[in-house]
UniProtKB/Swiss-Prot annotation:
Species this chain originates from: Homo sapiens (Human)
GO CC term (a single one): mRNA cleavage factor complex
Any one Pfam family match given in the protein's UniProt record, by short name: RRM_1
InterPro entries for the chain: CID_dom (IPR006569), ENTH_VHS (IPR008942), Nucleotide-bd_a/b_plait_sf (IPR012677), RBD_domain_sf (IPR035979), RRM_dom (IPR000504), SCAF8_RRM (IPR034370), SR-CTD_assoc_factor (IPR051485)
Modified residue annotations for Phosphoserine: 273, 617, 779
Protein's UniProt name: SR-related and CTD-associated factor 8
Length: 1271
């Protein structure tokens, strides 16, 4: 008894918890009950008492205790040895009477438990049925024996009160033919049950009235049946139907349908002989209800039949017509849902149908959450012809999961079915042939029913839900897992679900303690749900819950159709948008049997339209569809081309001039008038981006001014972020561009995808753009910059006829004037100094506007884009990606060095978009072959004629005069050039020619660099490896000129390298993509690690040395640099001394960095090693004398001016960026006085750093060389 006491204490401790009760608590109670199984009677009694005495809100938890105990016992000991279920069933009626005293909201939970019991055969259907009736407010049926004394003569007239309902009365009140069918007490009890409701009493009264009128001698019943009776019949049937629909709970008629498949199966195959074998003493309520169903069918069928026999056909027709408006959906939905239940009596009168429907609805209301009820209710009033035709099909089509039971063929049901059959034959009077017909019909329907049942079983095995007529089933394969331990990992879930099948994804939400597991196959998800919901499976310390989850593909507008129990969204065909079909399958699958065949034809016609677009965008972004539409918004027909853009890139629609997208070349007469600012310039799809044009090929004969209507995605340079592989498919056959038209193409190609469509500078612009950009977003599969920011008239449009001098770099930052700020829209005509921030600067005549993404044509005087620091002679546009300045006529294309003659403003990728671009800088891809191939590997084919010179433009192309400042050689790394760097602009001036004062960069170094650089100006670009190698973040940034704030995160850093051989500013580092910047960018610039940067020794050595130094502490910073999204202000290290020698300089060859490098080394290196070195005084001296001074002197000479100028900037930046800096006060002084190398060795420094510093210095060179060599 100790176990019983323990159980009682657990059970009554429920009162200490506020409902709902946790699963853990239920588990404890269940365990206590199982331990006390020897005293199971006590346990059962305790639970029943608890339910009886507890507060209303604890009634349902009490039921859950019963459920948990019974199911656990069955699970543990097997159904046969389970003692709890039979014991609970002894007193279950009174227990449920107590349970139904719960709050009204909880009744649905009780019904749900009953349905689950029924579904899982926890209790017999005859036990559960009365409990369900109770929920509907129907008192449990009382079976009273029929006694002779209870019979009384029925002499009631319509006006007199109705006699009390007793089986005997019922029998007497029925016409003789009916009485012959109602013989035993079972049937009588069932009829009594039916007639106990008010509707039943009305029905009885109507029957009596009909009987009385039949007895009166009247010429015809037509006269006898006054309209009032018909109206009453109609009202009654309508009332019953409405009642069924209104009640969530079951109405008496609904009980007519048995819930239990077992029970129905009992009737399914059984002949009368089978029924006689069953014990007559037990008259389960469900059996009674089943009988009552047949009686219902009989009664109403007989009424209708009588009316027909009396030639009242037109009356019934009238009845049907009045009821037809009530039909919610066509008959076939009824058939689909109900299966063969309707085939049982296809042509019965409308009144009988009304009764039958609620019963069928019962099935669906329970299993399909009553969603079908509304649809199915009024469907009864369908003409007889429909019934006759459909009766044959119904059995085959019935698919509802629950209809194995509804297909039952009890003798009575067969009788009613056969009657309907005989009535079809001209309603001849009932005859003996009915029995033969019944057999024939039952055998026929049986085979079809069996097929339907087998098909249904197959679907159930696959975990597919019942099919609803004219409804699309979107079956979820996503499972919600609840009560997941917060410490659980994704691997725990994977381990649990792997056994069921392939997992597509797992999305954990630890704060809510849940997860969404998406399986690849519905069947796997179904099995996982079945198994994991039945037992207590734990993840970590918690027992998980599991249920169906709405799959991702179903949008909110369809959530109302979601059925959580079945894990399916039933979407009516009329509400399905064909465009959404593919999306539905995300996280789920579409039941192909429910797909409307018409959709297939619609979809098959659509691809034809889209083929044109897809050919134009060979590298569409995954899951992006390319759609071409004629924009009706604009008065002229404008083809809106949507180019898939890399997912991170905002899409904008290009509005080309009024040509269809498919048109490869604009009509000859088309003039290159720039579109209004809010429209994008158009590009010629037939022409490749400027960077790709083979230089040697003479331009085809095409009017240069022509503006291509649209830029085909394939032509557009793939966005930088793309990998070369994505570009492989692009066909370059069409890439050759007529010289005249090159400009237009060039402008587009240069735009980086990330930035494309964002007018970096202009903020007002977005508003104008919105309609176009949003409505027709151009997504370029390649992320290509092909689209130009709205404001920019595409070069094609702007450049139209332009002086040949305009060059464009695809993917390379064009030259921009640092000082000039460009408006995202169009700057309008500007003097040569105009630079565009958008990220593309083309040399433009002063008149040219520059658009947000592209700088209009600028006079050659424009020296470089923000990204390029080098000063160019005024005439030469500098392409960040191009090496060297070219005569104005020579266009630089990133891929071609000066390949193209005149046309083509440089296109800089719109760097201004600060955030988009960085993360995947195409630059990396481009770098390897940088200058020659703007896109680099991406369009290798495009420049057949051009040698892949690393950074050197063909001599013929480049003018030596032009070269002096050309930092151009630095390759496309510059693509991210920053259009205008406010910081840089002023600084640079000294460097630039007088003509472009704005452009100049403050660095005095520029001039110096020229001297030193010449030798190294076009060093071969390092292998891609070096390029991609992440640079030490600090160094680069430090070296570069101050970084523009603009350069900040989003915009790809421009390589300031133009400035001197040294990389000017590593904006890039600031930007997201640092790795490329450092090494890669250097390579781009043509500074090989192998080549000496300045007078000093190999790049390689320094670079590597620096890298290692950074290696330890740097790791984090490098990472940060790579994905920097922080204060870019500090990152750049544009400090004066940094400025003097780009960060690279620091990293690679600047001794000045030594001080903090030393500190860093101290931190990073083994202290033992450091200490040894520190101890060696000679080593320090040696270092000072031999090693440090020469490099410093050179460095100073080289970058003197810059160093002095930039001191201030660098300090904060360095601190922000580099860990080295933080910990090292000594380095700061060094920065402040970079020129004084001696300071490092000065007594102060020595004191600060102590011997360690000196030792570090010594060690550093060693480390450098070692690492460099290794590298």
């Amino acid at each position: 008894m100790e176990a019983v006491k323990t159980f009682n204490s657990e059970l009554y401790s429920l009162n200490d918890y506020k409902p709902p009760i946790s699963k853990a608590k239920m588990t404890q109670i269940t365990k206590a009950a199982i331990k006390a199984i020897k005293f199971y009677k006590h346990v059962v009694q305790s639970v029943e008492k608890f339910i009886q005495k507890c507060k209303p809100e604890y009634k349902v938890p009490g039921l859950y205790v019963i459920d948990s105990i019974v199911r656990q016992s069955r699970h543990q000991f097997g159904q046969e040895k389970d003692v709890f279920a039979p014991r609970f069933s002894n007193n279950i009626i009174s227990t449920f009477q107590n349970l139904y005293r719960c709050p009204g909201d909880d009744k649905s939970k009780i019904v749900r438990v009953l349905n689950l019991w029924q579904k899982n055969n926890v209790f017999k259907s005859e036990i559960i049925q009365p409990l369900l009736d109770m929920a509907a407010g129907i008192p449990p049926p009382v079976v009273t024996p029929v006694l002779a004394s209870t019979t009384t003569a029925m002499s009631n007239t319509p006006g007199t009160p109705v006699t009390p309902v007793t089986p005997a009365n019922v029998v007497q009140g029925l016409p003789d033919p009916w009485v012959s069918q109602i013989t035993n007490t079972d049937t009588l009890a069932a009829v009594a049950q039916i007639l106990q409701s008010p509707q039943g009493q009305q029905l009885q009264q109507l029957i009596q009235t009909l009987q009385i009128q039949q007895q009166k001698p009247q010429p015809s019943i037509l006269q006898a049946l006054d309209a009032g009776l018909v109206v009453q019949l109609q009202a009654l049937t309508a009332q019953l139907t409405a009642a069924a629909a209104a009640a969530n709970t079951l109405t008496p008629l609904e009980q007519g349908v048995s819930f239990n498949k077992k029970l129905m199966d009992r009737f399914d195959f059984g002949e009368d002989s089978e029924h006689s074998e069953e014990p007559k003493k037990e008259i389960p309520a469900s059996q009674l209800s089943h009988v009552s169903e047949s009686v219902n069918n009989s009664i109403f069928h007989q009424i209708a039949e009588q009316l027909q026999q009396q030639n009242l056909e037109h009356l019934r027709q009238q009845l049907l017509e009045q009821q037809q408006p009530q039909k919610a959906t066509p008959q076939d939905s009824q058939e689909g849902t109900f299966g063969s239940e309707h085939s049982a009596s296809p042509s019965q009168g409308s009144s009988q149908q009304h009764f039958l429907e609620p019963e069928v609805n019962l099935d669906d209301s329970i299993d399909i959450q009553q969603q079908d009820m509304d649809i199915d209710e009024g469907q009864d009033g369908v003409e007889e012809e429909v019934f006759e035709q459909e009766a044959k099909k119904v059995a085959v089509r019935s698919r509802s999961r629950t209809h194995s039971r509804s297909r039952s063929r009890s003798p009575r049901k067969r009788r009613s079915r056969s009657r309907s059959g005989s009535r079809k034959r001209k309603h001849r009077k009932r005859s003996r042939s009915r029995s033969r017909e019944r057999k024939r019909k039952s055998s026929r329907s049986y085979s079809s029913e069996r097929r339907a049942r087998e098909r249904e079983k197959e679907r159930q095995k696959k975990g597919l839900p019942p099919i609803r007529s004219k409804t699309l089933s979107v079956c979820s394969t996503t499972l919600w897992v609840g009560q997941v331990d917060k410490k659980a990992t994704q691997q725990d879930l994977t381990n649990l679900f792997e056994e069921f099948g392939q997992i597509e994804s797992i999305n954990m939400i630890p704060p809510r303690g849940c997860a969404y597991v998406c399986m690849v196959h519905r069947q796997d998800a179904f099995r996982a749900l079945q198994k994991l919901s039945s037992g207590s499976y734990k993840i970590g310390s918690k027992v998980i819950k599991i249920a169906w989850a709405l799959n991702k593909g179903v949008k909110t507008e369809y959530k109302q159709f979601w059925d959580v129990d079945l894990g399916v969204t039933y979407i009516p065909w009329e509400k399905v948008k064909v465009d959404d079909l593919e999306g539905f399958a995300e996280g789920g699958m579409i039941d192909q049997e429910t797909v409307n065949t018409e959709w297939e034809t619609v979809k098959s016609s659509e691809p034809v339209k889209e083929t044109v677009q897809t050919t134009q965008s060979p590298t569409p972004v995954e899951k992006e569809t390319v759609v071409t539409t004629q924009a009706e918004v604009f008065p002229p027909p404008v083809a809106m081309l949507q180019i898939p853009v890399a997912p991170a890139v905002p899409t904008v629609s290009l509005v080309p001039p009024a040509f269809p997208v498919s048109m490869p070349v604009p009509p000859p007469g088309f003039s290159p008038i720039p579109p209004p600012p809010f429209l994008r310039a158009s590009f010629n799809p037939s022409q490749p981006p400027p960077g790709f044009m083979p230089p040697p090929v003479p331009p085809p004969v095409v009017p240069p001014p022509t503006i291509p209507p649209v830029v085909p995605t394939s032509l557009v340079q793939p966005s930088l972020s793309m990998t070369p592989e994505t570009v492989k498919d692009v066909g370059f056959g069409s890439l050759v561009i007529p010289g005249g038209s090159v400009a237009s193409n060039l402008a587009t190609s240069a735009l980086p995808a990330g930035n494309v469509f964002n007018a970096p500078t202009k903020q007002a612009e977005p508003e104008e753009k919105v309609p176009h950009l949003i409505d027709h977003q151009i997504s370029s599969g390649e992320n290509t910059r092909s689209v130009i920011p709205n404001d920019i008239s595409s070069n094609a449009a702007i450049l139209g006829g332009q002086p040949p001098n305009v060059t464009s770099n695809s993917g390379i930052l064009g030259v921009q004037r640092p000082n000039v700020s460009s408006n995202s829209e169009i700057l309008g005509v500007r003097p040569s100094n105009v630079s565009s921030s958008s990220g593309i600067i083309a040399a433009q005549p002063p008149n040219i506007l520059n658009n947000s993404g592209i700088l209009g044509i600028q006079p050659p005087s424009v020296s470089n884009s923000s990204g390029l620091l080098g000063v160019l002679p005024p005439n030469i546009p500098n392409n960040s990606g191009l090496v060297g300045v070219q005569p104005p006529n020579v266009p630089n294309t990133p891929g071609l060095l000066g390949t193209q003659p005149p046309a083509g403003p440089q296109n800089l990728p719109p760097l201004s978009i600060p955030n988009q671009r960085m993360p995947t800088m195409p630059m990396l891809d481009i770098r390897p072959g940088l200058i020659p191939q703007a896109p680099g590997p991406r369009f290798p084919l495009i420049q057949p004629g051009i040698p892949p010179q690393r950074g050197i433009p063909p001599p013929s192309v480049l003018d030596s005069a032009l070269h002096p400042p050309p930092r151009g050689p630095f390759p496309p790394g510059d693509i991210f050039s920053q259009p205008e760097r406010p910081f840089l602009a002023p600084g640079r001036q000294s460097v630039d020619n007088v003509t472009n004062p704005e452009k100049r960069i403050p660095l005095g170094n520029d001039n110096i660099q020229q001297e030193g650089d010449r030798d190294y100006r076009f060093p071969p670009i390092e292998t891609r490896e070096s390029i991609s190698r992440p640079p030490p973040v600090d160094v680069r940034d430090v070296v570069g000129r101050p970084i523009d704030p603009r350069e900040g995160p989003g915009r790809p850093p421009l390589d300031g390298r133009d400035h001197f051989g040294r990389p000017p500013v590593d904006i890039r580092e600031n930007l997201v993509r640092p790795g490329i910047d450092h090494l890669g960018r250097r390579d781009h610039f043509g500074f090989n690690p192998e080549k000496p940067w300045g007078h000093r020794g190999d790049f390689d050595e320094r670079e590597h040395r620096v890298l290692p130094v950074y290696g330890g502490p740097k790791g984090l910073h490098e990472e940060r640099g790579r994905f920097r999204s922080g204060n870019y202000r500090f990152d750049p290290r544009s400090g004066p001394w940094n400025r003097g020698f780009g960060q690279e300089v620091h990293r690679d060859f600047d001794d000045r960095r030594r001080p903090w490098e030393r500190q860093r080394d101290r931190d990073d290196r083994d202290f033992d090693f450091c200490r040894e070195m520190n101890g060696n005084r000679l080593g320090r001296d040696r270092i000072q004398n031999t090693w440090v001074p020469p490099p410093h002197a050179r460095v100073f000479d080289y970058f003197e001016g810059a160093t002095s100028q930039r001191k201030g900037d660098n300090v904060p930046q360095v601190n922000g960026e580099n860990t080295e800096r933080h910990a090292q006060p000594p380095p700061i002084p060094v920065q402040n006085d970079p020129e004084l190398y001696e300071k490092l060795t000065s007594s102060n420094e020595i004191n600060k750093e102590k011997s360690d510093t000196v030792a570090d210095i010594e060690s550093e060179p060693v480390v450098e060389s070692t690492e460099t060599e290794g590298t």
